[in-house]
Amino acid sequence: MAYIQLQFHSDALMMQVTVNVILPERATTMIGMEANGTDTFKTLYLLHGLSDDHSIWMRRTSIERYASEYNIAVVMPSVGRSWYTDTVRGEKYLTFVSEELPGKCRGFFKGMSEKPEDNIVAGLSMGGYGALKVALTHPDRFGMCASLSGALDIAQIKDPGLLPEWRCIFDMNLQSADELAGTEHDLMFLASQLHEKGIAFPKTFIWCGEDDFLLQHNHNFAAHLTSLGVDFKYEISEGNHGWIWWDMHIQNALKYLIG
């Protein structure tokens, strides 16, 4: 696999950005890992959590090895603490991840398919929320999505310490998280919108650990999808909000989605 640290100017964010990219590679003398790259390939957009950045998946997991197994590209952006949202301050993080970033990458690197069935978005914690937000907002661009320990019921986040920064992201007048219910920031609302419009749901994998503080969020969202008749994969198993589990279950996500 080729590993590239990419820097370019984002019009959506109005600033320079850094993105880590892994690309399939052809090689005949590589030891310990397959290098059977093809001319076209699927792309995984892999999203970080609240405290992290574009580097974290490379530093904490073996994502390069997993990507090699499935012959996929992996694109890892950095979005700060934006909740993958077009903020009220003007930074368009949802637009960046769902529109601008794929377009830029396809321009820079040949072989990345534009077909929805060849584009996956996945993430952990805040990134799990972001992955489903991207996929449910743009199912015409992302045919598969995965959340690990995702904050999937944002209206139920009861941390008052987040409100000051959330007012700069979601709504300047926000008084509590439950005001986000029924808006474009609510994953259940987005799922219901797809159902009402008869739009095909992205192939979806959700995992959360039994000891994760976001477990009830995942139960709530899974129950909502079930009520809509959505066919999806929901796994609950041993684990908490930590990398030993995310490294394990990103493999399960890839196996379910494209294996």
Give the role of each language-model region.
Residues 1-259:
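Non-catalytic cap/lid and distal C-terminal segments of serine-dependent acyl enzymes
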